[in-house]
Amino acid sequence: MAAGALRGLPVAGGGESSESEDDGWEIGYLDRTSQKLKGLLPIEEKKEKFKKAMTIGDVSLVQELLDSGISVDSTFQYGWTPLMYAASVANAELVRVLLDRGANASFEKDKQSILITACSAHGSEELILKCVELLLSRNADPNVACRRLMTPIMYAARDGHTQVVALLVAHGAEVNTQDENGYTALTWAARQGHKNIVLKLLELGANKMLQTKDGKMPSEIAKRNKHHEIFNLLSFTLNPLEGKLQQLTKEDTICKILTTDSDREKDHIFSSYTAFGDLEVFLHGLGLEHMTDLLKERDITLRHLLTMREDEFTKNGITSKDQQKILAALKELQVEEIQFGELSEETKLEISGDEFLNFLLKLNKQCGHLITAVQNVITELPVNSQKITLEWASPRNFTSVCEELVNNVEDLSEEVCKLKDLIQKLQNERENDPTHIQLREEVSTWNSRILKRTAIAVCGFGFLLFICKLTFQRK
């Protein structure tokens, strides 16, 4: 076999190359005619054969050379050990053999651990997962960081390896650790556009509010890299299941993460009913209560539902009619941001009236949705505490949240009233200005009507929350 035929294979030392014949991983002609190596070859020749056997992945020859006296932790050029090289190419069989022969799974070279090397390897996720699992079984530290303060979970999240991320967390990896730039595993997944990783990390307790050194949250990183689906996902309200896996034991978490689809149908760790979660309220408000069981069986959260594509809807058994309702509701939820801070002073004074009116209309519609949601919850609440069959938290928790809601609604009502007074003041000044050309009466009437509706909706929402608060206090 010619030497040039195999030069495309990875080399140790992070892919650095060398034209020197003394390269630690140089691949030359491997003589297979003499494999009875017990003391017949000089030690240097054995080492050379060992390097070449490692490079081409010849497991049987590696074992034979180890039997002949080659050290399993011998270091080659760039200071890499055989185990580090095997991990870098995701050769799970070689990793297993070397570990069984006593190779050090915690070896580091220039702050580069073998576990980090495995998580950033070029190979299929299946092989990388096997290598990581083997290393973790030999007590490799899942939180060891490289020179850039990146941990194994960050590399796995960056490269899109969902199962590897989950396995690392199951063995104690910290989800919210930040690297030298302030990136977390969630930030890396958002940057690279790995939606499944983002969902898994949120489920495992990732904090989506942590900022990078330049003050960017994961959602902003996703938006900057044009991953709009992930941006919407991270911008949406909290997921009822967010962080639930953190409460499980290591064994339960591994079972949850690595089970097959058939196992999930038999063993629902999250099958217990969460009363009036975001998903239930959302579906109830759209008249889609019949979808609740279907979505729960498939472990689909509200966050996931609202970021689905059309093919995902169909794949999960959601009819086209129901799809249209969900998409219409999602469109209504997307209130466009008006970036006043990015506008010049002249532009601020001439901000589009249509945009401002559209903002008020959407705000009013949002208030209407909130009122409907609270009405539905009040309707579904049991009349007395004896009818509550499932375990609830202390009612004090509910009433305290209701009190905060009432306060927030009162604050919102106050701000809307200020806005209304300001607009009324501007309107009066314009009417009294002799140089002003009077607009059609219908426009001012319509604007006033919208503001009145918004104020009424806010006050009505506050009244409903007050009733809800009294209901909880009575119980």
UniProtKB/Swiss-Prot annotation:
PANTHER family listed in its UniProt record: ANKYRIN REPEAT, SAM AND BASIC LEUCINE ZIPPER DOMAIN-CONTAINING PROTEIN 1 (PTHR24157:SF3)
UniProt keyword Cytoplasm present: yes
Ranges: ANK repeats: 45-74, 78-107, 110-144, 148-177, 181-210, 214-243
Protein role: Plays a central role during spermatogenesis by repressing transposable elements and preventing their mobilization, which is essential for the germline integrity. Acts via the piRNA metabolic process, which mediates the repression of transposable elements during meiosis by forming complexes composed of piRNAs and Piwi proteins and governs the methylation and subsequent repression of transposons. Its association with pi-bodies suggests a participation in the primary piRNAs metabolic process.
Record region (Disordered): 1-25
GO cellular component: pi-body
Phosphoserine PTM sites in chain numbering: 17-18, 20
Residue ranges of every copy of the SAM domain listed in the record: 272-334
UniProt-listed SMART domains: ANK (SM00248)
Alphabetical GO biological process terms: cell differentiation; male meiotic nuclear division; regulatory ncRNA-mediated gene silencing; spermatogenesis; transposable element silencing
Transmembrane segments: none
Subunit structure: Interacts with DDX4, PIWIL1, RANBP9 and TDRD1.
Name of the molecule in the record: Ankyrin repeat, SAM and basic leucine zipper domain-containing protein 1
SUPFAM superfamilies: Ankyrin repeat, Pseudo ankyrin repeat-like, SAM/Pointed domain
Keywords from the named record: ANK repeat, Cytoplasm, Developmental protein, Differentiation, Meiosis, Phosphoprotein, Repeat, RNA-mediated gene silencing, Spermatogenesis
Compartments reported by the entry: Cytoplasm
Record keyword Repeat present: yes
InterPro entries documented for this protein: Ankyrin_rpt, Ankyrin_rpt-contain_sf, Asz1_SAM, SAM, SAM/pointed_sf
